[in-house]
Amino acid sequence: MSGGYPALELSAEDLRLMLAAHVHVGETNMNFQMSTYVHGRTKDNFHIIKLDKTWEKILLSARAIAAIDTASDVFAIGSRPFSQRAVLKFANYTGATAMAGRFTPGAFTNQKQSCFREPRLLVVSDPLSDHQAVMEASSVNVPLIALCNTDSPLTRVDIVIPCNNKSTHSIAVVWWFLAREVRRIRGEDTRLQQWSVLPDLFLYRDPNEEEQNVEDPEDARLEPVIPGADAEAAETWGVEPSMPVGSLGDMGIAAPGYGPVGGTAGGWSNLDADPTETW
């Protein structure tokens, strides 16, 4: 697929990135149509995907996407939570239309729906989880590009990108490669320089982990400066005050442990005296 051009060949850096993201690790099962993309098996019966085939299909898919005149006519679909962030980032950097989350049935076939769309090219993260979009794209003759694992069916798929579509790192790296090659083919970026966008931006982030890592600044200010100060304060909650709080007879409440005060002197020196004047 590189056509003999060294710039289009798989570099050692990109190969190390694929290996680190486990793009080559498939499933234990294999669809017979995916046998051409499988190199062999591991001792754990996991199939190994040929990364040279993966790179060739990424270049082919990027050329097909770049051939569309209007970038928004390319639809990137990812229904699983692990692929939604990668789909949104791909659409952001290539100008495509992202459909992250649940796909509405009839979005490509029912013209009476408010969400009806007419794409010219479809890119899905998994033909199994996105089967509704795959079926509707086939019904309206829309070309389809799919990230396929070793057990994925290739029915209705026009361009296959063999990769591990179950791993969060693998999904992020493949979508990142696809976005980078589309921008390079369009002339938006050059191959002589590294793309400034890192693959980490395409990686799925667990919202529960982020909430646990973020500390509330209000809670940080309320923490006691002296260790054990909160425990000492809690022990004195049930102790009666050493200073009388004054007579509460006028309010109908008797002060615990103290009788009425007969003194009439006011001022700050006599805190137990009742007020002699009204405001």
Swiss-Prot record:
Record's keyword annotation contains Ribonucleoprotein: yes
TM helices/strands, residue ranges: none
Domain of life assignment: Eukaryota
Assigned keywords, A-Z: Cytoplasm, Ribonucleoprotein, Ribosomal protein
Subcellular location: Cytoplasm
Location, primary (coarse class): cytoplasm
CDD domains in the cross-refs: RPS2 (cd01425)
GO MF annotations in UniProt: structural constituent of ribosome
Pfam family, one: Ribosomal_S2
PROSITE patterns listed in its UniProt record: RIBOSOMAL_S2_2 (PS00963)
GO BP term, pick one: ribosomal small subunit assembly
Keyword Cell cycle among UniProt keywords: no
Cellular component aspect of the GO annotation: cytosolic small ribosomal subunit
Function per UniProt: Required for the assembly and/or stability of the 40S ribosomal subunit. Required for the processing of the 20S rRNA-precursor to mature 18S rRNA in a late step of the maturation of 40S ribosomal subunits.
Record note on quaternary structure: Component of the small ribosomal subunit. Mature ribosomes consist of a small (40S) and a large (60S) subunit. The 40S subunit contains about 33 different proteins and 1 molecule of RNA (18S). The 60S subunit contains about 49 different proteins and 3 molecules of RNA (28S, 5.8S and 5S). Interacts with ribosomal protein S21.
Family the UniProt entry places it in: Belongs to the universal ribosomal protein uS2 family.
Protein known as: Small ribosomal subunit protein uS2
Native source organism of the sequence: Schistosoma japonicum
